[in-house]
Amino acid sequence: MDLETRVSGHEKPQRRNPEDPDCQYAKTRSSPCKPLGRFEEVASRTSAGSWTHQNGFGDTSLFEIYSNQAITGPYQQMGFRGEKRGYGNNKEVQERSCCHVENNQC
């Protein structure tokens, strides 16, 4: 199973939060920006290479990162906190987390 299928298979249905109009939700994977809510933190590891987070709705979604690289720098600035490690593609993490926790700008 390729990364695209694994990631899309874990997605929750996307919906807008009426109380957070600045955080728009993209509907297609071809969109350059897919904010999934305010990313307060990356929660505990759930399985090899998989991590959970809660988005602005309190939904828990699953995503994967590669290369054992810490989520710091631009990823941390987009709302990820701490030194979370796993496997996956950091580009995918960035793509799926572009709603900034502080200003909701993509």
Curated annotation (Swiss-Prot):
Keyword terms: Host cytoplasm, Host cytoskeleton
Cellular component, GO, one term: host cell cytoplasm
Location of the region described as Disordered in the Swiss-Prot/TrEMBL record: 1-31
Primary location: host cell
Subcellular location(s) of the protein: Host cytoplasm; Host cytoplasm, Host cytoskeleton
Biased composition (Basic and acidic residues): 1-19
Other facts noted in the record for this chain: Product of an upstream open reading frame of the genome polyprotein gene.
Protein function: Plays a role in viral replication.
Protein name: uORF protein
The organism of origin for this protein: Zika virus
Organism ancestry: Viruses, Riboviria, Orthornavirae, Kitrinoviricota, Flasuviricetes
